[in-house]
């Protein structure tokens, strides 16, 4: 075992070896193989390239060097293309703070039977008069950045439960294709986390309609890990034991305290001074904007072509992407 595997239990070490093909004897070589590909993408500012950081991308892609580098490139490309989203990315940002206090996300104290961290979202808590969908997404990304520091979670991953109880048609009507695609790109395509399951409970018909719209943007692996339980909490409990769930989800624990995770982040001051935020690396947002200008951009010869996440040029459909998916008319 190398120092990079410190903090992993014997069980998780074995899991990393069997499921992820992690080999302590070749770990540094694996990391260097990914690092050597960085030169092929001069159009991207790779703001962090240390061993521990690259390792989480290898674990997320089961030590496939090419796929790990693709994910690393998309991680920074997403941040470059959405600069405003990552400015002031800290728990004390007003929008993020309010989203966190309303349980976006909630983080349960117990792990599931596979050692995965359980995130919960109570969708009806979204107060659209106080913060936006983007604030919720920023709060989730900040939270994931904090949690992914734990090597156990890099190996074991996460489970997400979304409770749609009392989520109104009016709330759903505020969602647009561009919003949902932004979330999919940020969570599915650009973050080194292993999601073992995404569970919908108490979802109304219009959530099924929204899912139909976003389904084409989901990878096959993601689709297979989405479970629509409806009002049947017994089917949820077959996968996640009720002993570790709050009463809102039919569990045996007390109701979830929405402010628990918010207090954790605020108490530890997870903000732009930590390792999770672009400002803390070495390249400022202003520098990124300069580097991305046409005069300084270089043509990439990478096997991972640029523009994987690139927004299309202004075309007729752009206006449609800004329209609500569900109309109140």
Swiss-Prot record:
Full protein name: Clavesin-2
Alphabetical list of Gene3D superfamilies matching this protein: Alpha-tocopherol transfer (1.20.5.1200), CRAL-TRIO lipid binding domain (3.40.525.10), N-terminal domain of phosphatidylinositol transfer protein sec14p (1.10.8.20)
Subcellular location: Golgi apparatus, trans-Golgi network membrane; Early endosome membrane; Cytoplasmic vesicle, Clathrin-coated vesicle
Swiss-Prot/TrEMBL domain comment: The CRAL-TRIO domain is required for targeting to the membrane and for binding PtdIns(3,5)P2.
Its membrane topology: Peripheral membrane protein
Region of interest called Disordered, as start-end residue ranges on this chain: 293-329
InterPro entries: CRAL-TRIO_dom, CRAL-TRIO_dom_sf, CRAL/TRIO_N_dom, CRAL/TRIO_N_dom_sf
Source lineage: Eukaryota, Metazoa, Chordata, Craniata, Vertebrata
PROSITE patterns: CRAL_TRIO
SMART domains reported for this sequence: CRAL_TRIO_N (SM01100), SEC14 (SM00516)
Assigned GO CC terms: clathrin-coated vesicle; early endosome membrane; endosome; trans-Golgi network
Encoding gene, per UniProt annotation: clvs2
CDD domains, sorted: SEC14
Function: Required for normal morphology of late endosomes and/or lysosomes in neurons. Binds phosphatidylinositol 3,5-bisphosphate (PtdIns(3,5)P2).
Domain CRAL-TRIO: 96-257
Superkingdom of origin: Eukaryota
Organism of provenance: Danio rerio (Zebrafish)
Record-level GO BP terms: lysosome organization; podocyte development; renal filtration
One Pfam family from the record: CRAL_TRIO
């Amino acid at each position: 075992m190398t120092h990079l595997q410190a903090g992993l239990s014997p069980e998780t070490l074995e899991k990393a070896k069997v499921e992820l093909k992690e080999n302590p004897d070749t770990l540094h070589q694996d990391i260097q193989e990914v690092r050597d590909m960085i030169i092929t993408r001069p159009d991207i500012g790779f703001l962090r390239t240390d061993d521990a950081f690259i390792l989480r991308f290898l674990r997320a892609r089961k030590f496939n060097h090419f796929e790990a580098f693709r994910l690393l490139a998309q991680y920074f490309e997403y941040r470059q293309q959405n600069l405003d989203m990552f400015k002031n990315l800290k728990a004390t940002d007003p929008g993020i703070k309010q989203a966190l206090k309303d349980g976006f996300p909630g983080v349960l104290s117990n792990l599931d039977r596979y050692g995965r961290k359980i995130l919960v979202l109570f969708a009806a808590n979204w107060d659209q008069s106080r913060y936006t969908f983007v604030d919720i997404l920023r709060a989730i990304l900040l939270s994931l950045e904090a949690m992914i520091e734990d090597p156990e979670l890099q190996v074991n991953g996460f489970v997400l439960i979304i409770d749609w109880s009392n989520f109104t048609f009016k709330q759903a009507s505020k969602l647009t294709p561009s919003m949902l695609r932004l979330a999919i790109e940020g969570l599915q395509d650009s973050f080194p986390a292993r999601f073992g399951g995404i569970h919908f409970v108490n979802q109304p018909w219009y959530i099924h309609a929204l899912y139909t719209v976003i389904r084409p943007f989901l990878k096959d692996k993601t689709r297979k890990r989405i479970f629509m339980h409806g009002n049947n909490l017994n089917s949820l409990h077959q996968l996640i034991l009720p002993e570790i769930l709050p009463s809102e989800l039919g569990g045996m624990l007390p109701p979830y305290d929405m402010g628990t995770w918010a207090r954790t982040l605020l108490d530890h001051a997870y903000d732009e001074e930590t390792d999770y935020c672009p400002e803390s690396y070495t390249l400022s947002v202003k520098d990124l904007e300069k580097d991305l200008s046409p005069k300084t951009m270089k043509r990439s010869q990478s096997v991972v072509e640029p523009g994987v996440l690139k927004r299309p040029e202004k075309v007729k459909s752009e206006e449609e992407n800004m329209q609500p998916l569900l109309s109140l008319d």
